Amino acid sequence: MLAGCAQPAEQSTEEESGLGAGAVREQLSIVTGGTTGVYFQVGGVLANTITDGVEGQSGSAETTGASVENLRLLGSGEADIAIAQGDAVSEAFEGRNDFEGRAVQSYALAVLYPNVFHAVSLEENAVELGLECFSDIVDTRYSVGAVGSGNEATTTNVFSALEISTSDIEIQQLGYADTDSALRNDQLDAGSWVVGEGHAGLSELATTEDVHLIPMCDEEVSVITAATNSYTEHTIPGGTYPGIEGDVQTIAVWNLMVVGGDFNEQQAYDITSAMFDNIDDFVAAYAPGEEYMVPESILNSPVPVHPGAARFYEEQGVELPEDLLAQS
């Protein structure tokens, strides 16, 4: 699942210190997501890894609205390390969509694991409305995710690829907790969760309600993955969530750990090295990510790799293609 690398937008100002030449930051703010999500768990492990494993530095995981907000915080200098979806990272780097006119220099430290697109309904509603393929959500009450979230951005991209107009749907912009409540209270027919497989909030919903995951049919997957290289075909294995025994076809997008262009090169190397030295701790936080949290996954980055991290990967025998090598 290789992703093509984004091309940087014209930046309004040049990085004052140059690529990788900024001062070492002793206290690092790591922006993640909501407290029930995988980003927060992984960010917490990263914070501990930095504090315990990188001399003279400490990390703190911050709760946020996730991908889009994280990249904005990175761009404004209010965050040092951001965890975000690859589609949002690519758009930020190129200054597209939510980042039009406000490009964010974001370079990869690591590619973590894929976020999986879950289109979630309750079984009773799915049967009544005939939700057999994703496009069947037309004329339903559908939550695309919180305003400004990566969840909303990905859902919007899916709508665009499938030529689904927002005027054909009663759109709601709810976070995961509010989407959960609205489904339970029959205020919503379905909604998107673009999250790590086995997400705790979804598992809890499926424990107490009969949940239906709306599959993406073959043609839908083909159209979406052809529209952008940020997305790949994915199958949610049966048994991932309580009560859902069959496999569910959908799409996925890689998650990245990114820093700004002026992030110190040696510091980037040390943090990337410490992460992989302690990779078992990251796997303990998110077991489904075990097969993905390997150095070779960096080849799926949609943006160039930070020079400090690139040095680490090259030492591990990972040959980075030219489009993943950051240009000063």
Where are these regions (language model features)?
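Short beta-strand->loop
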Residues: V31-T36, V120-L122, I137-G150, Q173-L174, ...
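Extracytoplasmic "Venus flytrap"
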Residues: G18-L46, A66-S67, V147-S149
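Short, polar/charged alpha-helical segment
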Residues: V38-G56, T156-N157
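A conserved helix-loop-strand patch within extracytoplasmic ligand-binding domains
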Residues: A103-G148, S160
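Bacterial lipoprotein signal-peptidase II cleavage site
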Residues: C5-S17
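A local structural motif
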Residues: R25-Q27, T51-T64, S160-L174, Q187-A190, ...
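Pocket-lining segment of extracytoplasmic ligand-binding domains
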Residues: G86-A88, G95-D98, A108, E123-A126, ...
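An extracytoplasmic/periplasmic, membrane-proximal ligand-sensing/linker region
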Residues: D178, V195-E209, L213-P215, V223-T225, ...
